[in-house]
Amino acid sequence: MQTYDAGTFDVIVVGAGHAGVEAGLASGRMGAKTLMLTINLDMVAFMPCNPSVGGPAKGVVVREIDALGGEMGRNTDKTYIQMRMLNTGKGPAVRALRAQADKWDYQHEMKHTIEKEENITLRQGLVDRLVIEDGVCKGVITNSGAIYYAKTVVITTGTFSRGEIIVGELRYSSGPNNQQPSVKLSEHLEELGFELRRFKTGTPPRVKSSTIDYSKTEEQPGDDHPRAFSFDTVEMMLEQLPCWLTYTNETTHEIIQANLHRSPMFTATKKGTGARYCPSIEDKIVRFSDKPRHQIFLEPEGKNTEEVYVQGLSTSLPEEVQREMLRTIPGLENVEMMRVGYAIEYDAVMPDQLWPSLETKLVEGLFTAGQINGTSGYEEAAGQGLMAGINAARKVFEKEPVILGRDQAYIGVLIDDLVTKGTEEPYRLLTSRAEYRLLLRHDNADLRLTEIGHEIGLISDERYERFLAKQRAIEAEKERLQKTRIKPTAEVQAMLKEIGSGELKDGILAADLLRRPEITYDKIAQIVSRETFVTDEIAEQVEIQIKYEGYIQKSNLQVEKMKRMEDKKIPENIDYDAISGLATEALEKLKKIEPLSIAQASRISGVNPADISILLVYIEQGKIAKVSK
């Protein structure tokens, strides 16, 4: 095919899903001339699976994206149809916001946001190859012969990468939702020497709302006072749509059991590795055969559609089996299926081939982000996309990459896990993966990351000033409570008795009283007068910082210890073969991962403390061998 020069840019982003839109917006807003290429302009920021944003760990990622200057939180606040704070009965480390989004409004709003950015060109096109010169990525070539040149390229092709949809015995080449897949780019990456692996994910059927008998289900309303994802959002929509809870039963399970031989999950037709934490209904009834029922949530996909997402019923069973099992579920006896559930297999680049900046080790100037890196979920994709876009733009401007630490953000945990440990299955972010999760809370994402967002140019001066004012207000209120003494008056004793807290024998500082588990900031406010108004947001922050002060200090000490290890950098020219005493597995892993610090090396699977000690001695003695040839 004849090719032609279609233009030159600073950054090219391939794909416009949740990773791609964050990468493109970050790059463009930082001043880089950015081209975003996507197979179908009608699919920008499309939600091919669950129409929701947030949840445990993931909701914190959305807040972090917002604190750094990304778009997912703002877009969700504009387009949600339900908002709920999860785990409110637990500690602040595991609380998380989750929204049901209006699927169609979400993508239209995001596309409009991109179109308004003056530094971004949004264009429809299918990328088949990269332009590589002397190991450096210089651009992309589309299937129509257009050559676009750039200083850096970010690939965010997600499940479109050589995608194949599977429904029972039916298998065909496709991206999600029957879109055109990206086949030749995967083949080209293999030609370049990248290690790819087949992963799998799935989605449940969609059913028609008017054919559901909601009287047989349990209503799940949103919060009366919904919280925002974005620190920029001032007003929240109060009108929300409910979700509905129902359950599978023994009849459902019998139908599935009788058709397991037709499920790709249990036959040789499935080649990809599936997500452990998002199992299909077939997988659930086999793995948890003792359970008589499983939860099913009926979630509306938007305000102006009849489609309802059947959460908990992800499946790739044949179409007629899906219809039969749906109709065994209470409330769905006469349901009409609008879209069939399916599994999709796709290519993933093994992420240990990346630097922590998300630039590939094999090709300079080439970055990858999102599900192509082996992750699952919109939020994980968006977090990677944001960081890849930031670092692609910074490379153009000859600046050092931004690498978030495990103590700074869940995004930092996510990327470090990927590039240091790799993944054998679609990676899902969990609170248990973060060793400093008390520091990485939903409520303090702005306190952790706004400074960085402002420094790199994604947070405006106006927003930064508001952030500084909030910081000052928090410190002022903490100081006031640490100086204010509460006397054991009749009013105070009555309040304490009412909530089952021990009465005071002597006066006590307000901050010390607040440390009691049963005492809230609101209770303190009832007995301690205030000269200035304190917002709910500031009150929450003051209460958490005072109440959990001891635990937070302990976590900070652990962070300091870890940072001393992070500060011990491993020289770029180190020759691991020259280090005697390293275990064979450790030697192989260190050569493959190429860790940047002793701390990162210590997190590599197969590298044990003895290997780290040998490595430390080698570096500290200055025995850095000549560069390997």
UniProtKB/Swiss-Prot annotation:
Binding-site positions, FAD: G15, A16, G17, H18, A19, G20, V127, S182, Q371
SUPFAM superfamilies per UniProt: FAD/NAD(P)-binding domain
GO biological process: tRNA methylation; tRNA wobble uridine modification
Cellular compartment(s): Cytoplasm
Keywords associated with the record: Cytoplasm, FAD, Flavoprotein, NAD, tRNA processing
Quaternary structure, from the entry: Homodimer. Heterotetramer of two MnmE and two MnmG subunits.
Cofactor(s) this protein requires: FAD
Binding, NAD(+): 274-288
GO CC terms, sorted: cytosol
Gene symbol of the encoding locus: mnmG
Pfam families membership: GIDA, GIDA_C_1st, SAM_GIDA_C
Listed InterPro entries: FAD/NAD-bd_sf (IPR036188), GIDA_C_N (IPR049312), MnmG (IPR004416), MnmG-rel (IPR002218), MnmG-rel_CS (IPR020595), MnmG_C (IPR026904), MnmG_C_subdom (IPR047001), MnmG_C_subdom_sf (IPR044920)
Family under the similarity heading: Belongs to the MnmG family.
Segments for region (Disordered): 203-226
Gene3D superfamilies, per the entry: FAD/NAD(P)-binding domain (3.50.50.60), GidA associated domain, C-terminal subdomain (1.10.150.570), tRNA uridine 5-carboxymethylaminomethyl modification enzyme MnmG/GidA (1.10.10.1800)
Record protein name field: tRNA uridine 5-carboxymethylaminomethyl modification enzyme MnmG
Task performed by this protein: NAD-binding protein involved in the addition of a carboxymethylaminomethyl (cmnm) group at the wobble position (U34) of certain tRNAs, forming tRNA-cmnm(5)s(2)U34.
Comp. bias (Basic and acidic residues): 215-226
Naturally occurring in which organism (per UniProt): Listeria innocua serovar 6a (strain ATCC BAA-680 / CLIP 11262)
A GO term, aspect molecular function: flavin adenine dinucleotide binding
